[in-house]
Amino acid sequence: QRIKVGGWKEEVWYCYYSIGRAYNLLFTSDNMRNSNYIFHAVHYWMEAYNYYPDRIENLYEIVKLYREQGKYNLAYQFYLMADYQRKHHYSDDHLFHAKSIYDYKLDYELSIMAFYVDVKPTDIHKNIYRLLSNNVIDDTIFNNILSNYKFYTPRLRDLDKGEHPQNKIQDVCREFVKTNPGFSMSTPSIAMTEAGELAMNVRYVNYKINEKGEYINKDKIISRNVMYVLDQQGENLRTSFNVQHDAQYDGLYVGLEDIKLIDNDGHLTYICNRGIQPNKIQVEYGLIEASGVCSSRLLELEHQHPIEKNWVLFKNKNNSSLQFIYNWCPLQIGTFLDKSETNDTRTHNSFISEKHNTPRLFQRVRGSTNGIVVDNELWFVCHVVSYENRRQYYHIFVVLDPENEYKLKKYSQLFTFEKEHVEYTTGFVYNTNKKKFVIGYSTNDNTTNFVDISKEDVDNMFIG
């Protein structure tokens, strides 16, 4: 009756929209047996579009309906109609305006069905990053988006130029494994030394990850680390030695986990995770001498958590001091206390000195590599984990601006190295002359791999 009377366009449109929703509710409450309900629902939603095409809530309902029925091509065509209206006729001055549909729910539908229809990769990546950066999306939808992204994520291995020491290092790793039964080669960390040589730490572990993603541990979880140094051409192994650690903290966890290397004025410096007790992990920081001996200390923050890991180092270009990234949302930058040179009475030996805001996605970002300078910018590789039946690791390039208090400058789309579930990197280097990156990584904690990728290819992965 209200439709027949006419009058205010918003009310008439809302009547069409509501009748469609009522038929859809009948369809779902009838256990989806009577398809006539769906026919009537779509009919009234289309009448709403014909009457007032500027609004898209009705089109969204059709998109969602067909997507849930697996009719992805139909759903996508109605998505395109809704997206066009949203871009060209958007207004929030509507009766009962459903802001969430315009802001993210329509895009969320595309993130689910894009795998089945002809969507340009650049379009789906932009769509997903709008969603992942939206601060009002609830955790359930956010987690679903992250889970679905595995179907769209690029594989960095496909861009590999092959100019890296993978074969040479894998050969020496296999020799280590032969003489140390029960150990597997794992994540390499790499850093360019002041002398222009490539320093590389390879971690060897005594546990396995099975096909279900479960860790198969022995009585003790042991990490052994071997340092390899290649010449300036990266072709010949100049030296290698075992990294020796402070054994006083060995227990269930033995050794240094996830060493991340950085050259600090000719001193090979590292930061790593150190299992102290079954439910206590701290971060260790120190130097690796040419003899393999480490001088180290456990880092302590005021009010730190029982489990601390994934801190990463960088060199502050303004004062040449090493600092660390503690957290990514907000971006928290830490400073070391040198108590030997001060009268500081604090019991901790590091503190958070700066904080900067970052997008929603960075709540999930964790540090992987130490920072390196690339064209006057500070670059990191970080990781994001989607917690599913099997964990899914993604990676992301993050760039900070040294000229603006090390605030976030830009970041890339998420990527994988080989689309394996568990992938990890702890180091990368940049060749200024060749304008390329070499990144070391592992898959499922039982490989030692490298990828060589041009800066141009990486630049094409950045958002915006």
Residue ranges of predicted features:
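Start-of-helix register in tetratricopeptide repeats
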Residues: 11-14, 57, 100, 105, ...
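Flexible helix-coil transition and linker loops at the boundaries of alpha-helical arrays
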Residues: 2-12, 26-31, 47-48, 86-99, ...
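Hydrophobic/aromatic packing residues within the alpha-helices of TPR/SEL1-like helical repeat arrays
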Residues: 38, 45, 79, 128-129
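"A position-specific structural signal for the A-helix of alpha-solenoid helical repeats
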Residues: 18, 25, 61-64, 106-109, ...
